[in-house]
Design a protein with these regions (language model features):
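Alpha-helical, largely C-terminal catalytic domains
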Residues: 1-212
Length: 212
């Protein structure tokens, strides 16, 4: 094979349905440029949503033994899919952001996320588009054990980062202790023993001034 042939870019139009899959995957690259309120533990920069989704999925694997009956494969799928909509809607809601406690703001943002889900997942060919959208809706509805588990882990992750970086996003956004407890006490339904530990650490963070 000549060097000219070996260096020729792949013509994705020859892939048929793969073309749509590749287009979707390239669209996902934008998640690496969606930055969240939490910074990395070394505080060099804010974490991006792609990093959050990866850490979230690994956390779902790590905590699974403490949640009997949870379907880990499905929980991981929910973790990886749930924030893809931030490509269009952005990230303005996490446990370090005052808007996470504003119900009116949350409703408005949710409408944008629904639009984003429909656009982004329909980049995929059928039936994958339907499957991905169903996963996103399942996470959002918080009715299955897997979606409840995923939501609990998702709420815990920003909290854990704050507890290990001097409450960075809490301090920057003037978050109150009771706000975090109220928003995250849902964790106790899925991981009650872990929530007891977190509550103790939240009280310590409050005493240190990381939470108002």
């Amino acid at each position: 094979m000549s060097s000219a042939t070996s260096n020729k870019p792949l013509d994705v139009l020859n892939f048929g349905a793969f073309t749509e899959v590749v287009q979707f995957l390239m669209e996902l690259d934008k998640l690496k440029s969606v930055y969240r309120k939490n910074k990395l533990l070394n505080r060099e920069r804010h974490e991006n949503t792609a990093e959050h989704s990866w850490q979230f999925a690994v956390a779902a694997m790590a905590f699974a033994p403490y949640v009997p009956g949870v379907n880990l494969e499905r929980a991981i799928k929910l973790a990886l899919v749930h924030d893809i909509v931030e490509i269009d809607a952005g990230d303005v809601l996490d446990a370090g952001d005052v808007l996470v406690f504003d119900n009116a703001a949350r409703e408005a943002i949710h409408d944008e996320e629904v639009k984003a889900a429909n656009r982004l997942f329909n980049l995929l060919p059928s039936p994958q588009n339907t499957e991905f959208l169903a996963l996103w809706n399942e996470y959002d509805a918080v009715e299955t054990l897997e979606s409840k588990y995923a939501n609990a882990i998702d709420r815990a992750m920003p909290m854990l980062l704050n507890l290990h970086n001097q409450g960075q996003s809490w301090v920057e956004n003037h978050i109150r202790h009771e706000q975090v407890v109220s928003k995250c006490d849902y964790i106790q339904e899925i991981l009650p023993e872990f929530w007891l530990q977190l509550k103790q650490q939240l009280e310590q963070a409050h005493q240190k001034g990381w939470l108002l």
